Amino acid sequence: MEEGFVPVAKVADVPPGTMTFVAVERERIVLAHVEGGFYALRDVCGHRNAPLSRGRLDGCIVECPLHFAQFDIRTGKYVDGPYSADVPIYEVRVEGDTVYLKR
Protein backbone atom coordinates (compact mmCIF):
# COMPACT_ATOMS: atom_id res chain seq x y z
CA MET A 1 0.00 0.00 0.00
CA GLU A 2 1.12 3.54 -0.73
CA GLU A 3 2.84 5.59 1.91
CA GLY A 4 0.46 7.55 4.12
CA PHE A 5 -2.30 4.93 4.10
CA VAL A 6 -3.13 3.07 7.31
CA PRO A 7 -5.34 -0.02 7.73
CA VAL A 8 -8.65 0.78 9.45
CA ALA A 9 -10.96 -2.20 8.86
CA LYS A 10 -11.50 -5.50 7.13
CA VAL A 11 -13.91 -5.40 4.19
CA ALA A 12 -16.10 -8.06 5.85
CA ASP A 13 -16.46 -5.91 8.98
CA VAL A 14 -18.40 -3.21 7.09
CA PRO A 15 -21.18 -4.89 5.08
CA PRO A 16 -22.76 -3.01 2.16
CA GLY A 17 -25.22 -0.35 3.33
CA THR A 18 -23.60 0.09 6.75
CA MET A 19 -21.19 2.42 8.48
CA THR A 20 -18.91 2.11 11.48
CA PHE A 21 -16.68 4.20 13.71
CA VAL A 22 -12.91 3.94 13.31
CA ALA A 23 -10.11 5.86 14.99
CA VAL A 24 -6.79 6.80 13.45
CA GLU A 25 -4.51 8.21 16.10
CA ARG A 26 -6.80 10.78 17.77
CA GLU A 27 -9.05 11.37 14.77
CA ARG A 28 -12.65 10.09 14.93
CA ILE A 29 -13.80 8.82 11.53
CA VAL A 30 -16.98 7.24 10.18
CA LEU A 31 -16.37 4.60 7.50
CA ALA A 32 -19.25 3.60 5.22
CA HIS A 33 -19.71 0.92 2.57
CA VAL A 34 -22.20 2.26 0.00
CA GLU A 35 -22.70 2.02 -3.77
CA GLY A 36 -20.01 -0.65 -4.03
CA GLY A 37 -17.31 1.52 -2.46
CA PHE A 38 -15.91 2.66 0.86
CA TYR A 39 -16.06 6.29 2.01
CA ALA A 40 -14.81 8.04 5.11
CA LEU A 41 -15.54 11.37 6.73
CA ARG A 42 -14.85 13.09 10.00
CA ASP A 43 -17.10 11.61 12.68
CA VAL A 44 -18.25 14.95 14.06
CA CYS A 45 -21.21 17.09 13.04
CA GLY A 46 -20.04 20.68 13.33
CA HIS A 47 -23.39 21.83 14.71
CA ARG A 48 -22.98 20.35 18.21
CA ASN A 49 -20.06 17.93 17.75
CA ALA A 50 -22.35 14.88 17.72
CA PRO A 51 -20.79 11.64 16.40
CA LEU A 52 -22.17 10.95 12.92
CA SER A 53 -21.38 7.24 13.37
CA ARG A 54 -24.24 7.10 15.88
CA GLY A 55 -26.63 8.56 13.33
CA ARG A 56 -28.63 6.94 10.57
CA LEU A 57 -27.33 5.95 7.13
CA ASP A 58 -29.91 6.05 4.33
CA GLY A 59 -28.28 5.21 1.02
CA CYS A 60 -25.42 7.70 0.75
CA ILE A 61 -26.83 10.14 3.30
CA VAL A 62 -25.69 10.09 6.92
CA GLU A 63 -27.93 11.89 9.40
CA CYS A 64 -26.67 13.43 12.63
CA PRO A 65 -28.34 11.79 15.66
CA LEU A 66 -28.72 15.07 17.54
CA HIS A 67 -30.45 17.59 15.27
CA PHE A 68 -30.77 15.56 12.05
CA ALA A 69 -28.35 17.48 9.82
CA GLN A 70 -27.63 15.40 6.72
CA PHE A 71 -24.42 14.90 4.76
CA ASP A 72 -23.45 12.93 1.66
CA ILE A 73 -21.10 10.22 2.95
CA ARG A 74 -19.24 10.16 -0.40
CA THR A 75 -18.39 13.86 -0.54
CA GLY A 76 -18.96 15.26 2.95
CA LYS A 77 -21.29 17.86 1.42
CA TYR A 78 -24.13 19.28 3.51
CA VAL A 79 -27.54 18.11 2.24
CA ASP A 80 -30.17 19.30 4.74
CA GLY A 81 -30.80 20.28 8.35
CA PRO A 82 -29.77 22.95 10.82
CA TYR A 83 -26.03 22.94 10.07
CA SER A 84 -24.94 23.99 6.60
CA ALA A 85 -21.17 23.39 6.53
CA ASP A 86 -19.54 20.39 4.85
CA VAL A 87 -17.71 17.66 6.77
CA PRO A 88 -14.08 16.80 5.84
CA ILE A 89 -13.57 13.52 3.98
CA TYR A 90 -10.65 11.10 3.73
CA GLU A 91 -9.24 9.17 0.81
CA VAL A 92 -10.00 5.45 1.09
CA ARG A 93 -8.46 2.49 -0.73
CA VAL A 94 -9.15 -1.23 -0.58
CA GLU A 95 -6.41 -3.77 -1.11
CA GLY A 96 -7.29 -7.42 -0.72
CA ASP A 97 -9.56 -7.75 2.29
CA THR A 98 -8.34 -4.58 4.04
CA VAL A 99 -9.68 -1.02 3.95
CA TYR A 100 -7.03 1.71 4.17
CA LEU A 101 -7.39 5.40 4.96
CA LYS A 102 -4.99 8.15 3.94
CA ARG A 103 -3.68 10.22 6.83
Language-model regions, residue ranges each:
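Short cysteine clusters
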Residues: C45, C64-H67
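Short cysteine/histidine-rich metal-coordination sites, predominantly Zn2+-binding motifs
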Residues: G59-P65, Y78-V87
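N-terminal pre-ligand scaffold of iron-sulfur
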Residues: M1-G59, I73, D86-R103
